[in-house]
Swiss-Prot record:
Domain notes: A Gly-cisPro motif from one monomer fits into the active site of the other monomer to allow specific chiral rejection of L-amino acids.
Pfam families assigned to the protein according to its UniProt record, in alphabetical order: Tyr_Deacylase
Assembly and oligomerization: Homodimer.
Matching InterPro entries: Daa-tRNA_deacyls_DTD, DTD-like_sf
Protein known as: D-aminoacyl-tRNA deacylase
Compartments, as annotated in UniProt: Cytoplasm
Enzyme class label: hydrolase
Gene: dtd
GO cellular component: a single term: cytoplasm
Keyword Transport: no
HAMAP family reported in the protein's UniProt record: Deacylase_Dtd
Keyword annotations of the record: Cytoplasm, Hydrolase, RNA-binding, tRNA-binding
Source organism, top-level taxon: Bacteria
Motif Gly-cisPro motif, important for rejection of L-amino acids per record, residues: 137-138
Amino acid sequence: MRAVVQRVTFSKVTVEGEIVGEIGKGLTVLLGVGCDDTEKDVEYLADKIVNLRIFEDENGKMNLSLKDVGGELLVVSQFTLYGDCRKGKRPSFDRAARPDTAKELYEKFVELCRSYDVKVETGKFQAMMMVEIHNDGPVTMLIDSKKEF
C-alpha cells in the first residue's frame, strides 16, 4: 500500500462540480492499493499516517502528529501510484489491486483512521476527481507499507 502524504492548510475533492470531501489544517493522503496488500498493510499505514510527526511544535521542529494538532484527514484513492514507468513510455498498472479488492482495503483504511478519533473526509472511489491541495511547507512524504522507497 502506498501513500503520498501532504501537510495542508486546506484541501478539497470535487466530483462533477460537487464538493465530496473538504478539510482545513491536516493531511491529504493519496492512497494506492497494491495487488498483494492485506489488512496488515492497512493497519501499518493508518497508524503511521495518523501518528506521523510532521507538524511543527512551538520551536518550529517537526514534532507533532495529526492527532496532536487536532488536524483533519482527506483520503483520496489513487491507483496510479502503482504505475510502473520503467519500460516504455506508457505506465503499466499490473501491480495495482483489482478494483473490488482496492475498494475494500481503501474503505478499511478510512474506517481505521476514523477509529483514531480523527475527522476523515474522502474522495469518491473510481471517480474522476478534481483535487485542490494547499500544501503547507511544502511538506510531502512518500510511505510504502512494503518499505520499497
